[in-house]
Amino acid sequence: MTTRTLRFYALVGFLVFLDQVTKYLAHAYLARDFIVIPNLFRLTLAKNSGAAFSFGTGFSWLFFLLGIIALIFIGWFLPRTTGSIVFLALLQGGIAGNVFDRLFKPPYFGNGEVVDFLNTPLFSGVVFNIADLFILAGVFGTFLFLKGSK
């Protein structure tokens, strides 16, 4: 395993750890909404059986399967890329954090619910988590990196 690959998986591991710690804290301490910035940002505990930003609610097993496929693809793609590993690590870490929830949170084994807790009126009715932000940053960063390399 190359140093680059080790750094990649160390970053992914750190991102998954950060995601799981924030979800644990939200689950343990958010009994009700906590307003951080009035009319802009609040913490709201929610459980999501859909994808990022509550898209596709009720299809947890499908997003679990797609997440596993994405993790395998990124792992396969990593040694074939010469670009920055940061955006791929953000993508891999975010996907892995939510796949972890689907696997180990009730009702378990691919059907678990993802813990969401970040809420802003900018995205009406959408509650999300740190892993969703990692995925979003990874997708946009990878897209911009690939677009800029042409």
Curated annotation (Swiss-Prot):
GO terms for biological process: proteolysis. One of its GO terms (cellular component) is plasma membrane. The active site is at residues 116, 132. Pathway: Protein modification; lipoprotein biosynthesis (signal peptide cleavage). It is found in: Cell membrane. One of its GO terms (molecular function) is aspartic-type endopeptidase activity. This protein specifically catalyzes the removal of signal peptides from prolipoproteins. Belongs to the peptidase A8 family. This is Lipoprotein signal peptidase.
